């Protein structure tokens, strides 16, 4: 589907809306799955207020649901300089792509038993950091600044001793979004992961939040109703949450993210399309994988690599027929993606109604089904 885009659709200001602070969910629901669902018919504009637990009632027969199976890494490290000053580092490179360097000048001085890799991350410190500065995060993790980029993004040498995932699990914090105004806690270790998350897909720096609403029992219900499942991988990184700063959104450059689509998933989608069954993307990350690969390759095919696709009104969707998603931040690339799918004015009108009806917004908030 392609919406006829207008000049207003390309203005960043066209994606602004007022959101009362108390509509931003600070905690997950008491139980997983106790979320609301706002169903939007993107052709007629009809809106239905429902429960997410009743999702099966609102899906077309035989739908293929495609979910992101990446798992959130406790990627936020709190440490200090040699002088004692506090620093913070958020690893952006997907964990499976952190490859130890061979011994040589690029790897610096590596002590026996230690590994080193060049990675990308976000750095914050009370005083400016410079190339060559060394930062410590416990006894077995440290970072040396290589190059500082814009908005805190930096290339660094990451030094570690032991198993890297274990070290992050021990020393790291879940990188909750800044609009959640509290420290991460024990509940987030479970509730900020989806039921689709796989240990061998550990490395996202934010949850694919549409998946947070699903429970094992809901998956069983959907399967019993004749719906099918497929998975893709997108390691959620800077591209998903970096702000759009251009007055004309067409000038925005997305930061790339690493994705994987298996032959099994491609075949499941081909069968669904051949049978006339809809493909339902569980979240904008799943949507970005499918559309990113199909756009880059001309068709959907098995793929492991990067995507920097940016969808906004005027984009023609090639794979995704329906979309399950949360409510997104004003002026964000994700709101633009949803607007590309259902029309900017229709989406913003739906958001206004959701605010009036008391829906919870953003990562731990309620969901929409756009069909």
Swiss-Prot record:
This enzyme catalyses: 7-aminomethyl-7-carbaguanosine(34) in tRNA + S-adenosyl-L-methionine = epoxyqueuosine(34) in tRNA + adenine + L-methionine + 2 H(+)
Its transmembrane ranges are: none
Keyword flag Transport? no
Claim: Cytoplasm is one of the keywords in the record: yes
Q: Which InterPro entries match?
A: QueA, QueA_dom1, QueA_dom2, QueA_sf
The record's subcellular location field reads: Cytoplasm
Query: One Gene Ontology cellular component annotation?
Result: cytoplasm
Annotated keywords: Cytoplasm, Queuosine biosynthesis, S-adenosyl-L-methionine, Transferase
Q: Which Gene3D superfamilies match?
A: QueA-like (3.40.1780.10)
Q: Tell me one GO biological process term.
A: queuosine biosynthetic process
User: Which pathway does the record list?
Assistant: tRNA modification; tRNA-queuosine biosynthesis
Show the GO MF annotations: S-adenosylmethionine:tRNA ribosyltransferase-isomerase activity
Give the E.C. number(s): 2.4.99.17
Tell me its family: Belongs to the QueA family.
Assembly, in brief, is: Monomer.
**Which HAMAP family would you find in this protein's record?**
QueA (MF_00113)
As for what it does, the entry says:
Transfers and isomerizes the ribose moiety from AdoMet to the 7-aminomethyl group of 7-deazaguanine (preQ1-tRNA) to give epoxyqueuosine (oQ-tRNA).
The protein here is known as: S-adenosylmethionine:tRNA ribosyltransferase-isomerase
Q: Per UniProt, what is the name of the gene that codes for the protein in this document? A: queA
